[in-house]
Amino acid sequence: MTLLLALALAAQGGVATQLSPAPLKLWTIAWQRPLVPPAPLQYQPRELGGPAVDPVSGIVVVGTRDGWIHACDHEGRRAWDFRASGAFDAPPRIFEDVVIAGSSDGHLYALELGTGRLRWKYDAQEEVGTTPAVSGGLVLAMTLQDSLVAVDARTGEWKWRHRREPKEGFTIHGGAAVAVAGGLAIGAYSDGTVAALELQTGTVRWERRVAPQGDFMDVDGLRAEGGRLYAAAYSGAVYALDLQTGAELWALKTPGPCRLALGGGLLVVVTTTQVIGIAPHGGVVRWTMPLEGEPSGDPVAVGARAAVPNTKGLLWIDAATGRLLRVFDPGTGVSASPAFRGRRVYVLSNAGDLFALDVV
């Protein structure tokens, strides 16, 4: 009787009989490696450190919240491990044969890529919660207390420091990594200021406040490309500035912008409520996509897709339309930025498992 009723209803036009389309296949899981042991009674853990991958050897290096840096080869075999005394809250930087990472214990560490042996460490005396940059023989890093430090890339010897007094009261945890372009090192600060400094000396070329007045004025996203600097201020604005002068090129007012990515002729902006695709040269909004879950690490724009870390998982978005294609959900969400090497993508889950995905 039930079957006859279903057939009769299907014959009446207006009743759908087709199943929903199968999810779009974007990747296969090549391997999974647990890196962080489960902690008892830990509620909703978050792994902010994330992976970096060497484009030559394929070695992937991951910093985790329990103070370890782990290195694995392309097949997921453990290569080496290094222990610090504080958490790693941003992906490391691989430069030539060296891994450089900042820790909440206040140190910058330089390790040999092949062995994990400590080459040098620098005591910044403040939490280093951003990915270091390497340029002009210098390692540059922002601390979480609003200092931009520069040290010799070979020895770790101090070269210069630029500091602004942190804004009083609470600020958003984390911050923007140093951007380097055009002979300048650009830092972002919790008082809403962006400062462009001469790379070799730390001399201020220009400073500009980009954050509207508000409770949280942190500048949490920076990207530089093509003579332009893009900045995201949490209190409600995305700016494009002339890299050499700081002059405003365009501004977009939107609540809660906190992370940026550039790629494929698109500026991807992640806010607390949505993801926005913007034309970098004119500031025209091409698309918006509502965001569920909390944003965290920096998005990555690669080719026709953008990958956005989120407490719901790693969101895969069509860069041309803003359509959500798939979500890679390891069960605990993804707070760290992914790392790409060719068709291979490395993702660290909030449970501390490292996944290797092969994009199809």
Language model segments and positions:
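Sec-dependent signal peptide recognition
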Residues: 1-6
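WD40 beta-propeller blade core
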Residues: 70, 109, 149, 195, ...
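Short loop/turn segments that connect beta-strands within beta-propeller blades
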Residues: 73-77, 112-115, 152-156, 198-202, ...
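Blade-level signature of beta-propeller repeat domains, shared across WD40, Kelch, NHL, RCC1
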Residues: 330-360
